[in-house]
């Protein structure tokens, strides 16, 4: 259950937004990298962030929170713990030790593949899928497809940040996946 954050700001979303550092021209020129490590370093900001997700999903009757490799692994297990549900990792190819299902998706230059253990969830299990941000939506779409192939009901895709100019959240919504993000940044 959510904890009361001492000295919580009146506008928690604006506060979370203010805690995210922008690193210009990283990892390549023209990219404005949205760095969540500054948010994570603040106990107050982390508590408020987790509370926002927990308040949203406390009544969703979830079975699991799935996290996308790698930064989705930071917040998703905390939210799963607070909701008293399991955590399902969706990893880059070759990182899971047991039998897996895989899903490839397109990148700007090439493609990538993510995997899930074939016994990660059961048909009918209710799952949200989490990442740090939604850019093009490719990773979250691949994660959703994997979960659905296992028979899970993917309730929603969730992230701290949306980069709406890159079109990922629109792509996901148009594919039938509801999306929740705490904040958004223009550009890429």
Swiss-Prot record:
Biological process per Gene Ontology, one example term: AMP salvage
GO molecular function: adenine phosphoribosyltransferase activity
Subunit structure: Homodimer.
Main location: cytoplasm
Entry keywords, A to Z: Cytoplasm, Glycosyltransferase, Purine salvage, Transferase
Role noted for this protein: Catalyzes a salvage reaction resulting in the formation of AMP, that is energically less costly than de novo synthesis.
Name of this protein: Adenine phosphoribosyltransferase
EC number of the protein: 2.4.2.7
Catalytic activity entry: AMP + diphosphate = 5-phospho-alpha-D-ribose 1-diphosphate + adenine
Top EC class, one word: transferase
Family to which this protein belongs: Belongs to the purine/pyrimidine phosphoribosyltransferase family.
Superkingdom of this protein's organism: Bacteria
The protein's annotated pathway: Purine metabolism; AMP biosynthesis via salvage pathway; AMP from adenine: step 1/1
Species of provenance: Burkholderia ambifaria (strain MC40-6)
Glycosyltransferase found in the keyword field: yes
GO cellular component: a single term: cytosol
Pfam families: Pribosyltran
Places the protein is found: Cytoplasm
């Amino acid at each position: 259950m959510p904890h009361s954050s001492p000295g919580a700001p009146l506008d928690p979303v604006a506060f979370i937004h203010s805690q995210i550092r922008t690193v210009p021209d990283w990892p390549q020129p023209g990219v404005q990298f949205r760095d969540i490590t500054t948010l994570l370093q603040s106990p107050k900001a982390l508590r408020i962030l987790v509370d926002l997700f927990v308040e949203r999903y406390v009544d969703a009757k979830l079975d699991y929170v799935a996290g996308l490799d790698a930064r989705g692994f930071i917040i998703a297990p905390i939210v799963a713990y607070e909701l008293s549900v399991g955590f399902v990792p969706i990893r880059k190819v070759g990182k899971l030790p047991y039998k897996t299902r895989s899903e490839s998706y397109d990148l700007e230059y090439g493609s990538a593949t993510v995997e899930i253990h074939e016994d990660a969830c059961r048909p009918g299990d209710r799952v949200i899928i989490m990442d740090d941000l939604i850019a093009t939506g490719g990773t979250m779409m691949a994660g959703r497809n994997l979960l659905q192939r296992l028979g899970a009901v993917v309730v929603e895709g969730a992230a701290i940040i949306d980069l709406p100019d890159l079109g990922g959240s629109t792509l996901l919504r148009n594919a039938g996946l509801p999306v929740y993000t705490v904040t958004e940044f223009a550009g890429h």
